[in-house]
């Protein structure tokens, strides 16, 4: 087999592939044997009809087309390997010649991984900065713990104020008529939380337990229920009870309730240690990101649109998954925000372009430095996944048997190894 490759503009390459006549004839014969077993020709058992009879009934063109379908993907893959070409798009292929007894010739073009011109890999003067945990941060964590164990008790004053919890019945009216979703009973609202429409909670300030009052509000123009957006409504609200939040006392008993420690001081020390560990971890992550960003910024590469499009597609898929965890579909999100799919795509493009450039630069660094991922390292990662997710054994074994997933995991591991290499270079600098 012969293959020629020529560069075009914008990371495209054109190719022409010629498969030997003898090899193509073997493929045509293999196509005949396969198709002969699949059809019935009168007077012959399935698979036993002579080729001449088969061709008279179904035509020689059917055999040639089947042979092309079988050999072309294999020949294209071999051509990529011969030319050491890394495609980033599906090829556009045209069959030039396909006749039994003659070479199979096809040509086409494909977009390939762009050339990356690397700059510096180190010497950026990036320093790892680990902030010291303050006493205020520790106290904020303690306050959050107290908030979690807070209880609501009756406010003896009986008057609604900022921070109060009012137990209410309410019904809303627009132009004197009640509307769907505008009624509730025994609802507890925290004044100042912003849970309700702007103006509703403020309208309850000063109300007494047992009092009924009217609160006038205007629904926001971007309100999710479009039939209510921008409209004025009057809510009839009855305050049944006023409560206030009561925090547990910060003492040793509290420490024992929320932790395995016996004293508040031990709890404080543990919180400070955990905050320090988190700060160190974040500092390490920030350092890694800054190093990778600096290396990418110092390199030059023409980022292909097809890769940006694919990255945006992946990002939208991830976003859709995040929404699903909140019980929201992407269509619902579009309705709530008023943004179209095209708007979302356009918003994500700059970030996607940056991410694609980073991937291309890291791949170029790995190639220049000579970093690789061995089969042993790949298998070790699968073993690690099996140990980490004991309930997913069957699924992980399926992934282990998938050539596509193995290739993806190898790329991910190589990317990790490359980042570690750059971090090491810049830590020593």
UniProtKB/Swiss-Prot annotation:
Involved in protein export. Acts as a chaperone by maintaining the newly synthesized protein in an open conformation. Functions as a peptidyl-prolyl cis-trans isomerase. Pfam families: FKBP_C, Trigger_C, Trigger_N. The keyword Nucleotide-binding does not apply. Keywords: Cell cycle, Cell division, Chaperone, Cytoplasm, Isomerase, Rotamase. It catalyses: [protein]-peptidylproline (omega=180) = [protein]-peptidylproline (omega=0). Its EC number is 5.2.1.8. One of its GO terms (molecular function) is protein folding chaperone. The keyword Transcription does not apply. Residues 163-248 form the PPIase FKBP-type domain. It comes from the Bacteria. InterPro entries: PPIase_dom_sf (IPR046357), PPIase_FKBP_dom (IPR001179), Trig_fac (IPR005215), Trigger_fac_C (IPR008880), Trigger_fac_C_sf (IPR037041), Trigger_fac_ribosome-bd_bac (IPR008881), Trigger_fac_ribosome-bd_sf (IPR036611), Trigger_fact/SurA_dom_sf (IPR027304). The gene is tig. HAMAP family: Trigger_factor_Tig (MF_00303). One of its GO terms (biological process) is protein transport. Its main location: cytoplasm. The lineage of its organism: Bacteria, Bacillati, Bacillota, Clostridia, Eubacteriales. GO terms for cellular component: cytoplasm. This is Trigger factor. Signal peptide: none annotated. Belongs to the FKBP-type PPIase family. Tig subfamily. Consists of 3 domains; the N-terminus binds the ribosome, the middle domain has PPIase activity, while the C-terminus has intrinsic chaperone activity on its own. It is found in: Cytoplasm.
């Amino acid at each position: 087999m012969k293959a020629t490759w020529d560069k075009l503009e914008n990371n495209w390459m054109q190719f022409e592939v010629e498969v030997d006549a003898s090899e193509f004839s073997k493929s045509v014969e293999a196509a005949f044997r396969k198709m002969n077993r699949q059809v019935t020709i009168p007077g012959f058992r399935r698979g036993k009809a002579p080729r001449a009879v088969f061709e008279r009934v179904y035509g020689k063109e059917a055999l040639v087309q089947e042979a092309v379908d079988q050999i072309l993907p294999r020949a294209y893959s071999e051509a990529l390997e011969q030319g050491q070409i890394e495609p980033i798009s599906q090829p556009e292929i045209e069959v030039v010649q396909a006749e039994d007894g003659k070479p199979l010739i096809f040509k086409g073009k494909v977009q390939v991984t762009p050339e990356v011109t690397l700059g510096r890999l180190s010497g950026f003067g990036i320093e790892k900065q680990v902030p010291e945990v303050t006493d205020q941060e520790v106290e904020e964590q303690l306050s959050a713990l107290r908030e979690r164990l807070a209880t609501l008790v009756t406010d003896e004053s009986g008057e609604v104020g900022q921070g109060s919890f009012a137990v209410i019945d309410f019904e809303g009216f627009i132009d004197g008529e009640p509307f769907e979703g505008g009624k509730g009973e025994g609802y507890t609202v925290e004044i100042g939380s912003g849970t309700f429409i702007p103006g509703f909670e403020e309208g309850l300030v000063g109300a007494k337990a047992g009092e009924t009052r009217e609160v006038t509000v205007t629904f926001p123009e971007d309100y999710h229920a479009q039939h209510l957006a921008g409209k004025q409504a009057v809510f009839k609200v009855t305050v049944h009870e006023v409560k206030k939040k009561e925090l547990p006392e910060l003492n040793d008993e509290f420490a024992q309730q929320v932790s395995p420690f016996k004293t508040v001081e031990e709890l404080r020390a543990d919180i400070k240690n955990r905050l320090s560990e988190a700060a160190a971890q974040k500092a390490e992550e920030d350092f890694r990101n800054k190093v990778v960003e600096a290396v990418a910024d110092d390199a030059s590469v023409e980022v292909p649109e097809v890769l940006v499009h694919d990255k945006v597609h992946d990002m939208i898929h991830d976003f859709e998954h995040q929404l699903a965890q909140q019980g929201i579909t992407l269509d619902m999100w579009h309705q709530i925000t008023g943004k179209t799919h095209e708007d979302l795509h356009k918003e994500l493009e700059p970030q996607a372009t940056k991410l694609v450039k980073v991937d291309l630069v890291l791949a170029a660094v790995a190639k220049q430095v000579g970093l690789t991922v061995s089969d042993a390292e790949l298998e070790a990662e699968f073993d690690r996944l099996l140990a980490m997710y004991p309930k997913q054994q069957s699924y992980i074994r399926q992934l282990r048997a998938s050539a596509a997933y193995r290739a993806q995991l190898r790329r991910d591991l190589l990317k990790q190894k490359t980042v570690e290499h750059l971090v090491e270079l810049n830590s020593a600098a």
